[in-house]
């Protein structure tokens, strides 16, 4: 079992090698400049590596890029083996990264929240308070109220 630092270094190396080969070494038109390697994770035994990628474009370009990565998997693995210098070259698995879609969804939700906040702000622009503007007692009011309460208590005792 390898230590975490070694697995992290190997994952970083795999990410760099795969990204460089996609830019310069692979001549597949499906793997144009719209494929980005976002992250790489290596198992503890350094035998398997998961490469996360994003594709800028529509669903057809995503499917084409996925097929292109699967066809170039052997070439990419051999390049990783040359660069890594480990006893066993990790098996590469390509997984489309869901982070951009999740971020886009969160941005849409935040936009909806901003719009609803703006509607509430517009609706409350001409509104007035149901009671007084400041419903809380002030310290000088508390003193006068407590004196009246003490006098009322004294009168209640004498009435009995």
Curated annotation (Swiss-Prot):
InterPro entries: KH_dom-like_a/b, RbfA, RbfA_dom_sf, Ribosome-bd_factorA_CS. It is found in: Cytoplasm. It holds the Pfam family RBFA. GO terms for molecular function: ribosomal small subunit binding. This is Ribosome-binding factor A. One of several proteins that assist in the late maturation steps of the functional core of the 30S ribosomal subunit. Associates with free 30S ribosomal subunits (but not with 30S subunits that are part of 70S ribosomes or polysomes). Required for efficient processing of 16S rRNA. May interact with the 5'-terminal helix region of 16S rRNA. One of its GO terms (cellular component) is cytosol. Residues 112-160 are annotated as: Disordered. Residues 112-122 have a biased composition (Basic and acidic residues). SUPFAM superfamilies: Ribosome-binding factor A, RbfA. Coiled coil: none annotated. Its main location: cytoplasm. Keywords: Cytoplasm, Ribosome biogenesis. PROSITE patterns: RBFA. Residues 141-160 have a biased composition (Acidic residues). Monomer. Binds 30S ribosomal subunits, but not 50S ribosomal subunits or 70S ribosomes. It comes from the Bacteria. One of its GO terms (biological process) is maturation of SSU-rRNA. Belongs to the RbfA family. It comes from Streptomyces coelicolor (strain ATCC BAA-471 / A3(2) / M145).
